[in-house]
Amino acid sequence: MTRKNTTTNPWAKFHGPNLGYVIEQYDLYVTGAGSVDPELQELFEIFGAPSFQDDVVTGDNTATHFSPQNTGNIEKILKVVQLVEQIRSFGHTLAHINPMEDAANGQSLIEKTMNELSDADLKAIPAKTVWQDAPEGIHTALDVIHRLKDVYTKSLAYEFSHIQDSEERAWLHQMVESNSLRQPLSNKKRTALLKRLTAVEGFEQFLHKTFVGQKRFSIEGVDMLVPVLDEIVSEGAKGGVEDVMIGMAHRGRLSVLAHVLEKPYSHMFAEFKHAKIEGAVANAGWTGDVKYHLGREQVVGNEEVSTRVTLANNPSHLEFVNPVVEGFARAAQENRKKSGLPEQDTTKSFVILVHGDAAFPGQGVVSETLNLSRLNAYQTGGTIHVIANNAVGFTTDSYDSRSTKYSSDLAKGFDIPIVHVNADDPEACLAAANLAIQYRTLFKKDFLIDLIGYRRYGHNEMDDPAVTQPQVYKKIKNHPTVRAIYADQLQSAGVLNADEVETITQFMQEELKAEYAQVPPADTSAATIHVKVPEVVAKGIQPIDTGVSIESLRAINEGLLSWPEGFNVYPKVKKILERRKDALEENGKIEWALAESLAFASILQEGTPIRLTGQDSQRGTFAHRHIVLHDTDTNETYSPLHRLPNINASFSVHNSPLSEAAVVGYEYGYNVFAPETLVMWEAQYGDFSNTAQALFDQYVSAGRAKWGQKSGLVLLLPHGYEGQGPEHSSARPERFLQLAAENNWTVANLTSAAQYFHILRRQASILGTEAVRPLVLMTPKSLLRHPLTLSTASQLSEGRFQPALEQENLGAKPNKVKRLVLSTGKMAIDLAAEIESGKHEYSLDEVHMVRVEQLYPFPAEKVQSIIKRFKNLEEIIWVQEEPRNMGAWHYMAPILFELAGDKVKTGYIGRPDRSSPSGGDPFAHKAEQELIVAHALDVKYNFRQDKQEIEVFSN
């Protein structure tokens, strides 16, 4: 049956699961119980049974010559192979990774397999049959199992089996199974680590005793977060990283500020004491924020190796800082000083995100941000995630806050390696940090450390956690701190003696006392009820000429309509583009999309980079932009804006994932870190922007007032009532207007292509200056090609953006005008269309109309000057297409009252209060819209005396 060949041994190349397969095949070959792989059958015929010889044979610990024929127990071999893989995949289930619990026990899969194998069975099998790369000193399968259990089931536990790339998975296993990851620390480094833990503990305890009852959201229980961050930052700096961006919530933030970002203790104490201290640099805006929300930027390291660390400002809306910090990093990585796409270098910066164990699985923005990690428009070359896991969210236990075993399980779906580590094992924590930074450097992908500890006090320092977790807090009360545990370990190892440990502690206490002594008494004079907005913000954006010569515009347009020879533009798109050829000639008309492209090109030629993202931004939701062309034969892409002459700034336009919150946060962060760049986010429809409401509320509208964090982000929000129902009508302008105050941003709803051209150029001109602020634009849908929104070349080449426009062909007889109509956006165009149509039977002599292009800040002086022309004015009315409780009415009402004075009535025409923004019946919509227009322009419709509105509809 077998043609035995003794000259070579082909079985040496089979190991682990592959070996198991070969043995199974040989069993089938011998018994004839099933079909055998033809190639293996030939090997069995030539070489006989698989046999293996260990490299080293010494004493009782080494298996001698071994083969299935010698032992007759193939099942034992297979079980060992199975056991090895089980330990690698499920060792974390037995690991001692929770300092508040004993090591895991019970009938796990691993233990079940272990019980089926004796030590004698394991000793009989050479190590290399189940572990090809077994380290020196590992001779038998028993040695292998002991070694792997030591690696995978102690205070470090790993989850790598979900990693799809076999090369990455092999590298991870090799790193943790070899000796390279857990090299013993030098006594010097161990002493330094103890000093660091002493500083963290001492700082927190000093705050606890000195500022009794004040909120600080202590780090105690996960103290090792600070050394972990130290290690990652330090290793990054050694690798040449210029910027490390950190995003984290309030838990442990003060300690991170003091230690990782080197904020002086005296400055921290001054904030608690409400005192002014010399040298303190305020990073807050005019309204400010609580101390545990504030960020900091600091160069750390020494003359030889240093890096800039940025801790992002953060609200208490957990995890929403994540995409903001990712945007920081991408901005830091990109060179935007050349035409074309920006040049990205992921070695220049990286992100560390510190998550909460309840927030990581609980907040949807986490998964939205993780989804960005591999996308070309958003990837940053890998983020290091650290879950500061204290096993409780305020008063909610983990079994009530997540449906998964670990808080980190969400990361598995994004192919992210996970290390769980006991926060009471300092050296294991540093090993995890080192693995994270090495993986990120090599593979440019995300990595997650689950730092499992506890929370020594309540959610805040005024909270008693024993009310809801009495048993846990009995344990915690008697549990030694990680500093105490590590100090005992160093004493037992002979690294330090008790006196030296006490000296370290006393030195820390003396330093804290000395820092506190520098803090002057509380400065009560600083308290005031008057918040002063900086003058440059208060006075708003000053008039800026934004015209571009017709010659330049024509040259740009020619370039926009050019593409490489042989590039096959889609025929329908080609027709659209060809219609633009004569747009800048004497009788030409410029539509919205062309005005935008001309604005972009002129902005780029002036040296301002542009970044535009949105779910369909390359083509445009409404098939209007076509800023990226696709070859019909090859699917290659081409953007004319990358090839225009005289440009030394980058242009990038990306289709975003189906996400609003993460993408808005990312673009906001990008703009904060790249203030010279015109960054624009476009909603697919404005209706969907409200899923990013937390970003609008906490960052875009209030970031400067709270933190002094300037942004010039542009939001493009398609808005307009066209009978498309409640999900495709409203960008909720009322919400942006409700947030409008202190000149925090500009809110506009435009009615012409030229106005769009000028406002974009105005926005670009204020970037990087103190006058900068975000721009919120209600952009058109049906108006994109509407005849009344088209502009001429001269309207682009002359003048500037106009916050308010008077309607042409009205108000020619000022003494006859009784009604002044104010409106904005599509509603204003609907009114203008009725005026231009000439089909109305009523006279328009008594009506004048103003298009309010800029809703906030409201152009009061301009409108007031118009009002003064009409001596017989009786009423000023606001007309809108949105329901009365939506749109701009509630924002406009007090403005109109003030403009009108005592003699002129003010009022509203539009839809009544409604719970839904729009109806779903297009015919009903059309009928309603016609009624609104008629009531607005026909003065026979008078206001009711008991209401300041014309009752167009009855509810």
Curated annotation (Swiss-Prot):
GO terms for molecular function: oxoglutarate dehydrogenase (succinyl-transferring) activity; thiamine pyrophosphate binding. Its cofactor is thiamine diphosphate. The keyword Oxidoreductase applies. The keyword Zinc-finger does not apply. It is an enzyme of class 1 (oxidoreductase). Pfam families: E1_dh (PF00676), OxoGdeHyase_C (PF16870), Transket_pyr (PF02779). Keywords: Glycolysis, Oxidoreductase, Thiamine pyrophosphate. It catalyses: N(6)-[(R)-lipoyl]-L-lysyl-[protein] + 2-oxoglutarate + H(+) = N(6)-[(R)-S(8)-succinyldihydrolipoyl]-L-lysyl-[protein] + CO2. SUPFAM superfamilies: Thiamin diphosphate-binding fold (THDP-binding) (SSF52518). Its EC number is 1.2.4.2. It comes from the Bacteria. GO terms for biological process: glycolytic process; tricarboxylic acid cycle. InterPro entries: 2oxoglutarate_DH_E1, 2oxoglutarate_DH_E1_bac, DH_E1, KGD_C_sf, ODO-1/KGD_C, THDP-binding, Transketolase-like_Pyr-bd. One of its GO terms (cellular component) is cytosol. CDD domains: TPP_E1_OGDC_like. Homodimer. Part of the 2-oxoglutarate dehydrogenase (OGDH) complex composed of E1 (2-oxoglutarate dehydrogenase), E2 (dihydrolipoamide succinyltransferase) and E3 (dihydrolipoamide dehydrogenase); the complex contains multiple copies of the three enzymatic components (E1, E2 and E3). E1 component of the 2-oxoglutarate dehydrogenase (OGDH) complex which catalyzes the decarboxylation of 2-oxoglutarate, the first step in the conversion of 2-oxoglutarate to succinyl-CoA and CO(2). PANTHER family: 2-OXOADIPATE DEHYDROGENASE COMPLEX COMPONENT E1 (PTHR23152:SF4), 2-OXOGLUTARATE DEHYDROGENASE (PTHR23152). HAMAP family: SucA_OdhA. Belongs to the alpha-ketoglutarate dehydrogenase family. This is 2-oxoglutarate dehydrogenase E1 component. It comes from Bacillus mycoides (strain KBAB4). The gene is odhA.
